[in-house]
């Protein structure tokens, strides 16, 4: 079980919040003080709260749930796509399409269209069209891939959302809350922590800080998946043992 240490947080600037004039007073309990007009986040709390969030992620995946990583700001896009992909989880990095969760049936139609276009290019069907039409289809596929590529294999809603900058991702937060999907979020000093189920007080702007948290949550997903597989193997062994017991009893009776 790998948690993020305070040393790692200090090295990546997790403790630097926003300018004091841009704060949300609800974040007061998580602020250590201010320096040169910048709020300093209390990392002792961040360390503890990250552990709670980490364990929630592990437990969710261990029980067969899926996590959606959400981070559309420029600093987060690469890390979110890379780490969510490594962990085999869903992600959104380009822009949040309204209704991605609350109107998933409609979004699914766009996903089906994306898969159809990918199949056409993969098997050469697209070559039946004229060059101009092929270029149009390529642009359509690229646009859909940029928006939906991270959720194209999502056949049901995620059981947990992990968000970088809930202030920016306000529409995604509203959809999760409406559907009762628990939210883990890296929450800077300008955010409303009341909207988040598992708050991780921290810098949501610095690339190194973002990478630290995103990689750690991806590791938590992988840890949960390993536990799920281990339990599944144990259950299979137990079933096999139960199935063999009657046969052993019959053999003994003979």
Swiss-Prot record:
> This protein's superkingdom?
Bacteria
List this protein's GO terms for biological process: translation
Query: Is the keyword Hydrolase in the record?
Result: no
- Where are the annotated segments for Disordered? 228-254
* Keywords in alphabetical order: Ribonucleoprotein, Ribosomal protein
InterPro entries referenced in this protein's UniProt entry, alphabetically: Ribosomal_uS2, Ribosomal_uS2_bac/mit/plastid, Ribosomal_uS2_CS, Ribosomal_uS2_flav_dom_sf
A Pfam family found in this protein is: Ribosomal_S2
Q: Could you tell me one molecular function GO term of this UniProt entry?
A: structural constituent of ribosome
Question: Which GO CC annotations does the UniProt entry carry?
Answer: cytosolic small ribosomal subunit
Q: Which CDD domains match?
A: RPS2
The family database entries (Gene3D superfamilies) matched by this protein are listed as: Glucose-6-phosphate isomerase like protein, domain 1, Helix hairpin bin
Renumbered to this chain, the Basic and acidic residues biased-composition regions fall at 228-248
- Tell me yes or no: is Ribonucleoprotein among this UniProt entry's keywords: yes
Q: Which family does it belong to?
A: Belongs to the universal ribosomal protein uS2 family.
Under the heading HAMAP family, the entry gives: Ribosomal_uS2_B (MF_00291_B)
> NCBIfam families recorded for this chain?
rpsB_bact
- What name does the UniProt record give this protein? Small ribosomal subunit protein uS2
Species of provenance: Nitratidesulfovibrio vulgaris (strain ATCC 29579 / DSM 644 / CCUG 34227 / NCIMB 8303 / VKM B-1760 / Hildenborough) (Desulfovibrio vulgaris)
What taxonomic lineage is listed for the species of origin? Bacteria, Pseudomonadati, Thermodesulfobacteriota, Desulfovibrionia, Desulfovibrionales
């Amino acid at each position: 079980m790998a948690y993020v240490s305070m040393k790692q947080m200090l090295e990546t600037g997790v403790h630097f919040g926003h300018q004091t004039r841009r704060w949300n007073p609800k974040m007061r309990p998580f602020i250590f003080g201010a320096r040169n007009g910048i709020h300093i986040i209390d990392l002792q709390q961040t360390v503890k709260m990250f552990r709670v969030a980490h364990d929630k992620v592990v437990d969710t995946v261990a029980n067969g749930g899926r996590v959606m990583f959400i981070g559309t700001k420029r600093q987060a896009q690469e890390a979110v796509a890379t780490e969510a992909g490594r962990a085999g989880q869903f992600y959104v990095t380009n822009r949040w399409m309204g209704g991605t969760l609350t109107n998933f049936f409609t979004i699914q139609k766009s996903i089906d269209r994306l898969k159809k276009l990918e199949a056409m290019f993969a098997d050469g069907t697209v070559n039946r069209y004229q060059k101009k039409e092929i270029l149009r289809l390529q642009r359509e596929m690229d646009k859909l891939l940029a928006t939906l590529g991270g959720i194209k294999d999502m056949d049901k809603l995620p059981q947990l959302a992990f968000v970088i900058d809930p202030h920016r991702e306000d529409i995604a937060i509203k959809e999760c809350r409406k559907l009762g999907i628990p939210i883990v979020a890296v929450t800077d000093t300008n955010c409303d922590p009341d909207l988040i189920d598992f708050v991780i007080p921290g810098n949501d702007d610095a690339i190194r800080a973002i990478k630290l948290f995103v990689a750690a949550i991806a590791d938590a997903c992988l840890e949960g998946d390993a536990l799920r597989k281990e339990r599944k193997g144990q259950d299979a062994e137990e079933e096999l043992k139960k199935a063999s017991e009657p046969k052993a009893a019959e053999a003994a009776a003979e």
